[in-house]
């Protein structure tokens, strides 16, 4: 199974143009079974989606997981999950991550075999620590194969993720920010130990370098006790 994460910056590219179609082109090229998005909704008012649902339906093979609390948003606190048509969603959860800088996470169960969690953590490390503690506490209440993906906002390659504890193994697909000259591994993946990581990567193309300020990252996974629903491609 191939799972990807992409901070789309509300579909505003490095050229300062808001271009949802450009983001959808990137998503199509990922060829992923599941894509976790950050900054998928605008910040003001009812937080309307930066990717119009009709465009998603007409121009991709993805279906949004039902995470929004209204008719105009795509996700929760800007976190959204898209799944390929035909991939069964067996559960959805919105998770509050309070503290001074309120954030949220989303959890989507795929075919009862994998829980995909999307996060966009705070800018300050002490807030991130609190958010990770809360997230780990909630997730460990019900054990199942789990992949946490998103913008962890952690610049250090060796610290800052201690609150994940021993339940998760952290993977960094590579530098993904900023797109002009990627140096920071902000976009990461944490897996429970019952999931095998087959491959990982960062998608750097002419399109991804301008479509957002983050590059998409992806992982190819083997789930426990069963073959993945379809053969995952090894590239981005």
Where are these regions (language model features)?
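Generic structural marker for isolated residues within well-ordered, non-membrane alpha-helices
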Residues: 53
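Active-site regions of metal-assisted phosphoester/phosphodiester hydrolases
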Residues: 1-34, 42-43, 58-59, 63-67, ...
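Short, flexible/disordered intra-domain loops and linkers
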Residues: 44-50
């Amino acid at each position: 199974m191939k799972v990807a994460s992409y901070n789309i910056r509300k579909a505003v590219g490095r050229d300062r143009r808001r271009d949802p179609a450009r983001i959808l082109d990137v998503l199509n090229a990922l060829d992923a079974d599941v894509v976790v998005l950050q900054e998928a909704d605008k910040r003001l008012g009812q937080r309307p989606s930066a990717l119009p649902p009709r465009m998603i339906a007409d121009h991709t093979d993805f279906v949004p997981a039902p995470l929004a609390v209204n008719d105009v948003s795509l996700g929760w606190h800007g976190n959204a999950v898209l799944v390929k048509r035909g991939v069964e969603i067996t559960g959805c959860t919105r998770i509050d991550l309070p503290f001074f800088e309120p954030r949220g996470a989303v959890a989507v169960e795929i075919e009862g075999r994998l829980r995909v969690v999307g996060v966009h953590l705070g800018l300050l490390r002490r807030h991130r620590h609190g958010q990770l503690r809360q997230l780990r506490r909630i997730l460990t209440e019900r054990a199942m194969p789990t992949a946490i993906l998103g913008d962890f906002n952690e610049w250090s390659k060796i610290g800052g993720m201690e609150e994940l504890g021993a339940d998760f193994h952290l993977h960094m697909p590579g530098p993904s920010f900023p797109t002009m000259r990627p140096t920071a591994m902000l976009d990461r993946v944490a897996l429970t130990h019952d999931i095998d990581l087959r491959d990982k990567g960062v998608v750097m193309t002419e399109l991804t370098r301008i479509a957002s300020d983050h590059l998409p990252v992806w992982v190819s996974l083997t789930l426990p006790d069963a073959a993945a629903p379809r053969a995952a491609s090894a590239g981005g």
